A protein has these predicted regions:
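Terminal connector regions
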Residues: 107-134
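Bacterial N-terminal signal peptides that target proteins for export
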Residues: 2-12
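Low-complexity, acidic Ser/Thr/Pro/Gly-rich terminal tails and inter-domain linkers that flank the onset
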Residues: 26-46, 52, 133-134
Length: 134
C-alpha cells in the first residue's frame, strides 16, 4: 500500500511539474475587428462608413488602423463602385475587452457615386491594434 501511494504522489508531482513548465496556449490577448453597419452615399466622391470596433478577446487594446475591401452594389445587381486595401488610420481608440466601440469615418474617391436609391455592400476588414497607446 505504501508503494502505490508513493507511485501516485510521484506521478502527481511530475504531472504538476509538466503542467507548470508548458505555457498555456490560451493566453490573454485582444481580438479586435471592425464591422460595418451602414454605408451612406450622400455626396459624390465620398462614402460615409458607420461601424464599430468589436473586441472579443479578454484584454483591452488600442486600435491603430483598419484596412477595408468595399464593394457597393445597386439594387439591380450592378456593381457601382469597389476598392480594396483602403487603409484608415485611427487615433488610438481604446476598445475594452468584450465590448463594442462605435466609429464613423469617410472614404473619399472621385469614382464614388452620389446615390439615394437602394443598394447593398460587401466588405472585409483587417484591423491592427497594439496594447499601448501612441
Amino acid at each position: 500500500m505504501k508503494s502505490s501511494a508513493t507511485k501516485f504522489f510521484t506521478l502527481l508531482f511530475f504531472a504538476l511539474l509538466i503542467t507548470a513548465a508548458i505555457p498555456s496556449s490560451a493566453q490573454a490577448k485582444p481580438i479586435i475587428k471592425f464591422g460595418i453597419e451602414h454605408v451612406y452615399l450622400h455626396n459624390a466622391g465620398e462614402a460615409e462608413i458607420v461601424g464599430y470596433f468589436e473586441n472579443t478577446g479578454d484584454q483591452g487594446a488600442y486600435v491603430k488602423w483598419t484596412e477595408i475591401d468595399l464593394t457597393i452594389i445597386a439594387d439591380n445587381g450592378q456593381q457601382m463602385w469597389a476598392d480594396s486595401g483602403i487603409r484608415h488610420y485611427v487615433d488610438d481608440i481604446y476598445v475594452p475587452a468584450g465590448t463594442y466601440v462605435a466609429y464613423t469615418f469617410y472614404i473619399q474617391n472621385p469614382d464614388i457615386p452620389e446615390y439615394h436609391g437602394k443598394y447593398r455592400n460587401r466588405w472585409h476588414s483587417n484591423t491592427h491594434w497594439e496594447k499601448a497607446a501612441g
